[in-house]
A protein has these predicted regions:
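Internal active-site segments that recognize and position negatively charged phosphoryl groups
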Residues: 137-138, 142-165
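Intrinsically disordered, low-complexity "prion-like" regions in eukaryotic RNA/RNP-associated proteins
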Residues: 121-125
């Protein structure tokens, strides 16, 4: 069988996009892992299946789309960056209004819009639980929070002068693999406050 796919990137993450209307059933996790493999497959951070939530209008557009995001290991979650990429894709294809619409993900509905001033897609997350303090032993700096946006995130606060030579991979891997976050792991973000209203990540 042959299926169309698209490969899009947004702020450092790349995704394989599939029109779910072409698929009688979603692939298994092992297939997703093969596609996302950067040596043997297409290479990607995740796979996005999409389909209109309602019938297309006369112009071929739909204001609400379903988004099924699968991580590179085949697990399902919500991905904020993936939703931005999908909106930009649907907008470019002429399948969603230029101003925005709604994406329905595994954790609920999220509004997407075009940020005219910055000329970038933006997503308004649905209500999420407030951040909580991460366990001190799961942190490398002792200053960390945990927030679940539909996808779990460990936020590690560091000093701005640490960013230049910060070993994101090894430090992040150490936190991701902590027993506290087993068995699925956690997204790890290193964030520095560089001004009254400025963050670097």
């Amino acid at each position: 069988m042959h299926f169309n796919f698209w490969k899009w990137e947004g702020t450092g993450n790349d995704f394989i996009l599939f029109d779910q209307r072409e698929w009688p059933e979603l692939p298994i996790a092992e297939d997703i892992a093969v596609w996302c493999d950067r040596e043997q497959g297409l290479g990607a951070d995740g796979v996005i299946f999409f389909q209109p939530r309602t019938d297309l209008d006369d112009s071929g557009k739909c204001a609400a789309w379903e988004m099924d995001y699968l991580n590179a290991d085949g697990s399902r979650s919500f991905c904020g960056n993936g939703s931005r990429v999908l909106f930009a894709f649907l907008r470019a294809k002429g399948w969603m209004e230029l101003e925005g619409g709604v994406l329905h993900a595994c954790d609920g509905a999220h509004a997407v819009k075009w940020h005219a001033e910055l000329e970038v897609p933006a997503v308004q997350l649905m209500d999420v639980n407030p951040p909580i303090k991460a366990p001190h032993w799961a942190s490398s700096s002792g200053l960390s929070d945990f927030v679940d946006t539909g996808s779990p995130h460990h936020i590690e606060w560091i000093e701005p002068n640490e960013l230049e030579a910060f070993d994101v991979f090894s430090r992040g891997q150490g936190i991701r693999n902590q027993a506290h976050y087993a068995p699925d792991g956690v997204n790890v973000d290193f964030v520095a406050c560089s001004g009254p209203a400025a963050l670097q990540m």
